Amino acid sequence: MDGIKYEVFTEKSIRLLENNQYTSNVESGSTRTEIKHWVELFFGVKVIAMNSHRLPGKGIRMGPIMGHTMHYRRMIITLQPGYSILTLIQKRT
């Protein structure tokens, strides 16, 4: 799926699953409306709210030159009650 890179599983994101909120990293150039459309179309759910913040890239030294990795955007997607994204809450082995 274009735009969504991968799901995030941190302590906070696991806690947010109880409130029907899912966390994922997306491409930094994607807009909220694009991500909302992709999630509703791909997973067949109804999105009621989206929060996002941009995370900074990490610094990388290449000899005397200091570079950095690309920054990315993290989205917290809230679904309507009764909807869930089953592929994200299954236990991975």
From Swiss-Prot:
The UniProt family comment states: Belongs to the universal ribosomal protein uL23 family.
Q: Which UniProt keywords apply?
A: Chloroplast, Plastid, Ribonucleoprotein, Ribosomal protein, RNA-binding, rRNA-binding
Described by its record, this protein's role is as follows: Binds to 23S rRNA.
Residue ranges spanning the membrane: these are none
Which proteins does it associate with, and in what oligomeric form?
Part of the 50S ribosomal subunit.
Give GO MF terms, alphabetically.
rRNA binding; structural constituent of ribosome
In which broad location class does this protein mainly occur, judging by the first location in its UniProt entry? plastid
Entry protein name: Large ribosomal subunit protein uL23cz/uL23cy
Biological process GO annotation list?
Answer: translation
Q: Where in the cell is it found?
A: Plastid, Chloroplast
GO cellular component, as recorded: chloroplast; ribonucleoprotein complex; ribosome
Species the sequence originates in: Liriodendron tulipifera (Tuliptree)
Q: Which HAMAP family match?
A: Ribosomal_uL23_B
InterPro entries named in the record: Nucleotide-bd_a/b_plait_sf (IPR012677), Ribosomal_uL23-like (IPR013025), Ribosomal_uL23/eL15/eS24_sf (IPR012678), Ribosomal_uL23_CS (IPR001014)
